[in-house]
C-alpha cells in the first residue's frame, strides 16, 4: 500500500464535517443524509479514496443499523471509490452524530 502512495500524487483532497441536526421526528442518520444532500456540495464521482469517520458520544453510541445505513448511503454516493470507515467518540456531541469525510483523488506520477 505504501509503495502505491509513493508513486502517486493527490490531485484533489476534500474534508467535510457533517453533524446531525434532526428536524422534528427525524432520526440522526436521516439528518446526516439530508445535510449531505442539501449542503455538502461534493462531486462524488471525482474521488477514488474516501475515509469515513462516524463519531458519537459513548452514552449515545452508533447503532449497527445506523452504521449499515450510513455505509450503504456513502458507498452508493462514492460508488467508484475505495473507502474505509472508522468509529470514534466525542462526549461533547450528546445525542448528535458527526460524520467526517476525507476524500482524495490520486493520479500516477
Q: Which residues does each predicted region cover?
A:
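Tubulin/FtsZ superfamily GTPase core signature
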Residues: 1-109
Amino acid at each position: 500500500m505504501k509503495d502505491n502512495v509513493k508513486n502517486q500524487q493527490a490531485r484533489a483532497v476534500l474534508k467535510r464535517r457533517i453533524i446531525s441536526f434532526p428536524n422534528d421526528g427525524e432520526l440522526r442518520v436521516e439528518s446526516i443524509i439530508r445535510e449531505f444532500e442539501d449542503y455538502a456540495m461534493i462531486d462524488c464521482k471525482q474521488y477514488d479514496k474516501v475515509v469515513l469517520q462516524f463519531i458519537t458520544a459513548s452514552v449515545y453510541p452508533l447503532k449497527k443499523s445506523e452504521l449499515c445505513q450510513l455505509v450503504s448511503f456513502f458507498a452508493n454516493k462514492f460508488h467508484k471509490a475505495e473507502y474505509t470507515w472508522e468509529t470514534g467518540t466525542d462526549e461533547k456531541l450528546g445525542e448528535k452524530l458527526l460524520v467526517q469525510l476525507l476524500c482524495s483523488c490520486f493520479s500516477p506520477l
